[in-house]
């Protein structure tokens, strides 16, 4: 009986860790629960000096066991460029693969590392002005880490993105801190605070972009969450007319597989 109680407590603690919720703007190494097979969609408003861009991605991951995940992500894009008519259409398509490399679990905590591969297929429309698609094949390989406890979660991602057709290659680096604002319980009904940074260093042109991010995430059940966040540039080495004022994001994740 005592062994059964200990096992039950361990299962509930691990489930609560998974139910904490993934970071809004950074990848997670957790491949189960709300980070597992399902659907994620969100609206993203990018307000620049010379344009307003709306992006509506749809990502569908699918788990091949507990340590491997594949998926596909598409996006609808609308661009309102100053002094031009607005253009809209479907952007590039991304296939992704996640593979767990390391896992160490403790009571109410876990540390994990995964490798993630993103392959961009440039199917987006490029005949319009401005262009909807990138017209560039892109391959990105990154390492994603996460240390998640019942009280907080710390996430990081470092990767390199190879591009074609004259676009600059870039090094990506992301970090996030997730803090539950309500006591942990099961089934989950939680409110999480997300803060972090998201950066890109464009190696071919030696320019850097760093966004500070913050957001709120509401987990309504073990199969659904809603989230909203804002990103503000703190470093952006681009021409003034192309600078970003802020980025607003709101969306949902639903576990369906």
Segments the model singles out, each with a brief description of its role:
Residues 38-40, 69-71, 96, 112-116, ...:
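Residue-level detector of the transmembrane beta-barrel scaffold of outer-membrane proteins
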Residues 43-47, 74-80, 101, 119-123, ...:
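Transmembrane beta-strands of outer-membrane beta-barrel pores
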Residues 37-41, 54-58, 91-95, 113, ...:
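Hydrophobic, lipid-facing positions within transmembrane beta-strands of outer-membrane proteins
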């Amino acid at each position: 009986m005592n062994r059964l109680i200990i096992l039950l407590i361990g299962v509930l603690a691990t489930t609560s860790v998974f139910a904490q919720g993934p970071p809004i703007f950074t990848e997670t190494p957790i491949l189960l629960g709300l980070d597992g097979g399902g659907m994620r969609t969100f609206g993203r408003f990018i307000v620049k000096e010379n344009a307003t861009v709306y992006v509506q991605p749809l990502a569908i991951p699918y788990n091949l066991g507990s340590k491997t995940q594949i998926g596909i992500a598409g996006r609808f894009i609308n661009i309102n460029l100053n002094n031009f008519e607005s253009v809209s259409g479907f952007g590039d398509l991304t296939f992704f693969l996640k593979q767990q490399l390391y896992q160490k679990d403790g009571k109410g905590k876990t540390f994990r590392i995964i490798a993630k591969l993103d392959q961009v297929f440039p199917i987006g429309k490029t005949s319009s002005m401005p262009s909807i698609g990138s017209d560039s094949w892109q391959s990105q390989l990154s390492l994603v880490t996460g240390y998640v406890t019942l009280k907080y979660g710390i996430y990081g991602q470092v990767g390199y993105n190879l591009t074609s057709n004259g676009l600059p290659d870039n090094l990506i680096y992301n970090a996030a801190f997730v803090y539950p604002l309500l006591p942990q319980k099961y089934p989950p009904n939680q409110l999480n605070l997300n803060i972090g940074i998201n950066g890109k260093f464009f190696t071919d042109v030696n320019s850097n972009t760093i966004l500070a991010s913050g957001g709120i995430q509401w987990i309504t059940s073990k199969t659904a969450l809603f989230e909203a966040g804002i990103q503000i540039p703190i470093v952006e080495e681009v021409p003034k007319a192309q600078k970003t004022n802020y980025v607003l994001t709101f969306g949902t994740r639903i576990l369906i597989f």
